[in-house]
Amino acid sequence: MKNINFIECTLRDGGYHNLWDFDKSLVNEYLQVCKSLELKNLELGFRFPKSEEWLGEYAYTSESTLESLSLDDDFNIGVMINASDFIDEEQLNTATINYTFPFEASNSRIDFIRIATHIKDLNKSLELGQRLLDKGYKIAINIMQAHNLNKKVINEFSQLSKDIELQSIYFAY
């Protein structure tokens, strides 16, 4: 049987309840629990582009935030992004991409990025994924509202995604 890799995203998902404003001691305790459970792939938060309103630290999951944590070297650290934050008038916003991910993966504590997208933005999401792959990040695609997809759309997506090296595809109901 192949090895199964889980993505632990409790902290990122829990941020919907407190706007991603977690106390550092809680996050470090969470990391210790993840280590004891031998969880390797941790999606710690979002990485939203700059915003008019401040959300908690893990809405942005900056490099300085990651450097301040007790991260085990065995952890693969990930963030989630919303594809729509990087698309302006059906074009990718290169400035937003470069502002939000200023470093190559080799100079970042982030190993993987999960791109949440609606099917209408799928082409641009794959293009965004390729741009981030070119920076050395591992990429996963998270298709939202998958219950609305039919077999034809899923087959079209399968064809489109053949040209990009995705780590995983996640269909969110």
What is each residue range found by the language model?
Residues 165-173:
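Glycine/Thr-rich beta-alpha phosphate-binding loop at enzyme active sites
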Residues 10-11, 143, 173:
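Short, histidine-centered active-site or binding-site loop motifs used for metal coordination
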Residues 17:
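Metallocofactor- and cofactor-centric catalytic cores in central/energy metabolism, strongly enriched
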Residues 23-28, 59, 63:
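Short amphipathic alpha-helical segment that frequently serves as the phosphate-/nucleotide-binding helix
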Residues 26-39:
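Alpha-helical scaffold segments that flank or form the walls of functional sites
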Residues 35, 41, 46-162:
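Active-site beta->alpha loop and helix N-cap motifs at the rims of alpha/beta catalytic domains
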Residues 1-13:
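N-terminal amphipathic alpha-helix/helix-capping segment at the start of soluble metabolic enzymes
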